Each structure stands twice: as C-alpha cells, then as structure tokens.
Amino acid sequence: PEGTWKIYTMHLSRNFGYHRSYINMMNAKSCKILLDAVYEPHYAHYKEMFGSTIAGFFSDEPETGNGHIYEIEDKFGTMVDFPWSSDLFGVLSEEIGEENFWKLPLLWENGADVDLTANLRYTYMDAVTRLIQKNFSEQVGSWCREHGVEYIGHLIEDDDHHSRLGSSLGHYFRGLRGQDMAGIDDIGGQVLPGQENVCYNNGTFQHRNGMFYHYVLGKLASSAAAIEPHKHGDSMCEIFGNYGWEEGVQLEKYLADHFMVRGVNHYVPHAFTAKEFPDPDCPPHFYAHGNNPQYRHFGELMKYMNRICELITDGAHEVHTAILYDGEADWTGDVERSGKAAQILYDRQADYDIIPQDVFAEREFYHTQIADGQLVVNTQHYNTLIVTEYHYITEAFAKAVKEMTAAGVKVYFIGAKPEGICDVTADVADMGADAWKEAARQANMQMAAELEQAEVISYEKLADLAAEKLADTVTLAPSNDRIRVTHYEYGDGSGMVYLVNEGDQTYEGTVTLAETVRKPAGKERTLTGYDAWLNQLYSVYTEEGSNAVKVSLEPRKSIIWILDADSQAENDTPEIESTQKAVGEDRLTETVQQRIHKYRGTPETLADGWMRSTCRSIDYPNFGAGKEVSLPDHLEEEEPLFSGFVRYEKKVRIENPANAILKITDAAEGVELFLNGKSLGIQIVPSYVYDLSDAAVQGENELVIEVATTLEREMSTIPNRYGMPKDDPK
C-alpha cells in the first residue's frame, strides 16, 4: 500500500547477548540442570547434615540475563533483547494465538496503539514471570523442602528494577514465590543516613534512588513475608556489604534498625572473607584476620539484632494501609512509582504494606477476603488502599475496587484513575486489531464504572490523611519526619511498639499510643520498656490519665515498649534480665537516661589529665607508650593514617558510688569502658552512658576508655578495585 511503513524482523537465537551460559529461567528442564549440577551433589555428599548443619540454599541475584548487567534503562520500547523459551512459545500461543505473533514487535515499538501495546506487553510479562515463578523459583523451593531444608535469597531490587527483566526477574513477588523467606539486599551505600531524597544516575554501578531504598526496599520484604502464607512472616536482608572500609558499627546499627523497624526479621551479614588482608572485594570485612578493631563490637550488634528479631517474629505487624505494588503498571506504560506515596506515609508514622494485584486474582492462595470495611490478605487487615498514578490495571483489580468501595474499604488513586485494562480478553477468532480495539473500549468503559466510587486525591491530601487518620499507632508532639515506628502483635494478646530515630537530632517530645494499641478490645495492657542493647526491662511512666509518654530519643537509638495484657503471664518475648535495683514499689529499674533526666546538680567534666595510648587491632591489647592529652582529642591530626584501638586512662574520685554515671558525648566509634579493671560493656552509638555503681568504690577509681576505629584511615592509601578515587577519611 501507499504511504510510509515500518517493517519489523524478529530473530530467535540460542546464544545472543551477554549471558550465553545462563540457564533459562522460564524453562523447567534448564532450571533442573541447576538442581542436577549443584543441589543434588551436595545432598549426595552431605545429606546427613541437611536440616541441621545445612539449613538451606541461597539464590543470590538470579536474573533472566537479557541485556547488559545492571542496565537500568531497559524498559519496553528500548533496543534490548528479550528472553524467550519453548515454554513461553506455548503459553503465548494459547494466550494470543501463534497467528497473532505479529504483535510481538510492540515489545519495542512505542508509536503504536497504546491499549494494544499495553496488552501485549502485559501478556508477555505475565507469561514470563509466571514461568519464572513455576519453573525456577517454585521448582528449586520444592526440591529444598522435599530434602528437609529451606530456600532463601533475593533478586535484584536496585532502583526499582524488581519489575524488570535483565538483571532481575520481572516481578518481586512472583520471582520469590518459591522461597521460604522474602529476601532483599542492601549493599554499597544504598541506604544511608539523611539520604532519603538523594537520587542520581551516573552510569553502571553509579546510580541511586534514595526514595526507593528508604521507603520501598525494606517494605517489599516484610510485606511479602506477611501476605504469603507459606512464608510465615519470615523476611531476610543481606546487609552491610560493600559500603567500604569507612563503614563501622555506628552505620551498621543505623542500617540494622532501619530494616528491623520496617519488619525484616532475618539477616545475612555480608561479607566475611578468607583471603589475605586487605581484600579489596566488597569491604568492610568484619574480622579481616584480626585487623578490624570493631570485631567484638560487631558481635554486640549481632546480639542486639537477634533480640529485636525475636520480637518481630512469630506474630503479625499491625498495618492497616496498603500501597498497590507498581510492578505490573511498570510493564504497561508510564507509572508514578510508589516511593513518594510511601515517604509521605512513613514520614508521618503511618505504616503500610505493599501488595501486588495478584492478591485479587489469586484469592485462595493469598487468603484474600473483602468485607466489613476490611481488605484481608493472609494475616493482614487493611482499611485503606493507596494506588499511585497508573495508566493500566488488571481486570481482577478493577473488579476488586468496586467490591472494596462497596464494603467500606477506602481506595485512593493519586492524581488520576487508570485509563484502561491491561489484560483485556476478547472472544474474536483472529484477534485482529479492529476487533481487539473494540473489546478494549468496552473493557475500559466497564473499568471506569467499577472505579467510580474510588476517590482521586493529591499528594497534599494524602499527607493530611496520613497525619490525621492513617498514623494509627502513635502520635508525636511535636511532629518529626524521621521517627520510625512499627507495631507488632503476638498470639497471646501481648504486643510491642518499636521506635527508631533515623534523624540527626535528638527527639524531645511526647509519644502518645493510640487507644486501640494500649487497650485493644477495651482491655488495658501493661506498658513496660525494654532496652534491647542491655537486654533489660525498665519502667515506663505515662502522663496521668493518658497514653502519653515523654521521651528523649537520640539519633540512631531505639525505644521498645512491651504491651502485656497480663504482666504475670508467660509470653513469647525473649528471656530478659530484670535489674536488681527497684525504684520505689516498681518491680523494674529506671534507665540511666531517666536518672540523668532527674539529676538537678552540676555534673563534673573530665576533660584533662588523660593518658592516651594506641595499638593496631592485630596487636590488641598490647598498647604502646602513653601521652597525656585533654578531651576532645584530635588524634586524626597527629596520626592521619591510624586505625585501631585508642586507650584513655585516668584516675577519678567518686564520692557517691551508688549514683555514679559516666556520659561520653562522642567517640569514633565503638567504646568499651573499664572501671577498676572491670568491663562495663561495649556501646557503639553516642551518647555512651554507663552506670558505674557496680564497679565504683568510694574514693579513687581507675577509669579506662577504649575506642575502636574503623579501618578507613589505614586503608585510605590502597586503591579500590575499580580504580576510582577515594574521599578523604572522616
């Protein structure tokens, strides 16, 4: 015909692209090769250890393998190769008919009919991700469980890539369906203090979406763990790796609290290395053959994490707001990713889960119910659903919106409602373009009717809703956008509230528990504080006649409150020490911070007369010659390349040992305090506050403070493995 035409040619290849030796994630026989070559030989050799010494197998960043590694600009409509398999051929032949494979160029073409393009891309991705789910994830997971072990791991989530092919698996929830935990990883500066809104793209390995890492990444894991019945609430994060030698226990504690308060309850610390020190691959290394000064301090952090993870396991996190997973929408057109909506909620202490549209299509699997003002998905009960701006949604979700709004569940679309249905089905013999377009028009009209009762709101309105209605665990006065909170409930009627300060300033104010948290079903619960670092309970004082608690929460520190319906009853909380010093009639002690707050005298400042000595970690505890110094000490100016232990010694007079407290306002980084030869423990986040009463004597006392640095300064002269320049040591 006359006019300008575009001619497409498509080619199938067995050996095209960058990853020609990869298994085909969509092909059952190809994935079976992995089991035959790796898993079966391990079982043959170690089967008596399976289920005991060997807990399971870990898939680290499995990928479809098309395109270049970690390419983030690989949406449909770009010139990349797309994966194919005989299984996929069969599925698409059933879905659209082999005679309609003429539509496949729409994977690349952006100038065609938008509805037809969205439908083809959704159909392709739905088939690809379902095959990956079945032939890779579920096949490997089933093998593991049949052999008495678990299957865990994570896919590439970086910068919202969890919904793409290439270096990921196309759909976060489907890609991990066969695993026993919902996994993620955080490496290389993805989550960093104060960088919630820092975003850039400078090429491979140099891109960052701070909003995704801080507000979506952790919640993907805890959400999948909660809504998928076979995961039993278990999530996992590979953590700490590749942050560089400058990462120490202070940053590691921030990262641990960051993910635990978001509900992640299992961790795989990355990375130990058997190579000779210094190994340039993905530092820091926690032991480093004895060269890392913070190894013992890291051990104390592991104890802290274990205690909190015990508290966020075998129950359910109480969340009443859900955000719709944006993965399917990313396949079909432009989409407002979830990060901004998530940030608006989380910065106002309104917690949320992220749920896929699959919960409406696979109701039996997810135990989905809609009734009495609630959307129930497995253990979770939501009264509000947030949908960012999508062009297309599935037919199952559109029907569910009508059902939810009729049942009293609030459904909010940000900015605009969707324009169409992405999985249109039509009873036309040849699925020709004209017939299909008419079917799409009818489906879109039906969708508009189903969404009629849902409300369109702005981000500004969402912020108001978050502050006024959706933040239903605690209220802060004054408000603060860096206090994070999670609410967890156990089967015995007890609960837990966990707060973390991710900001850089101490929060001074009042935290008021919601009435539904303190008194579920009208029955008041006892409120007890738990110091997870010291593993001690303490008294919590509420303002008379209210659920308000005055708090002072320093940066990178946490508060945990245990809510117990029967304070004498046994519960599933970890074994906790109660200190022996009761205050008045209380069965528990006050914290050292509470005692400082009550102190009305003038504290003594210990600035002068300190003897300082140093040693490398490998030489500890053989310190060198001492030098008299005053505090604050600026060792970094004298020895700019030193890393190791710094020891400060001083004799101090204590007249009232029973009330003696030492507060160290800052140190870099880990601190261990000795009084008269007795260690009073390791602390890793300032201010470092120690109760001296157990070791102090009236009169003269010998005080020793040992500070463990990072390895950053010692390693600053060694080039990194990428040949990139290093920043000046902090």
Tell me the role of every PLM-derived stretch.
Residues F642-R653, Y688-V689:
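Short beta-strands within extracellular/lumenal beta-sheet-rich domains
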Residues A548-V551, V689-A695:
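Exposed aromatic-hydrophobic patches
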Residues Y541-T542, L680-I684:
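Short beta-strand segments within Ig-like beta-sandwich modules, predominantly Fibronectin type-III
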Residues P1-D60:
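Mature N-terminal, pre-catalytic/accessory segment of carbohydrate-active enzymes
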Residues N15-F16, S567-E570, A708-S716:
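Short acidic/polar inter-strand loop motif in beta-rich domains
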Residues Y46-G56, E61-F642, R653-P657:
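Carbohydrate-binding surfaces of carbohydrate-active enzymes
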Residues S558-I559, Q698-M715:
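Short, well-structured beta-strand segments enriched in hydrophobic/aromatic residues
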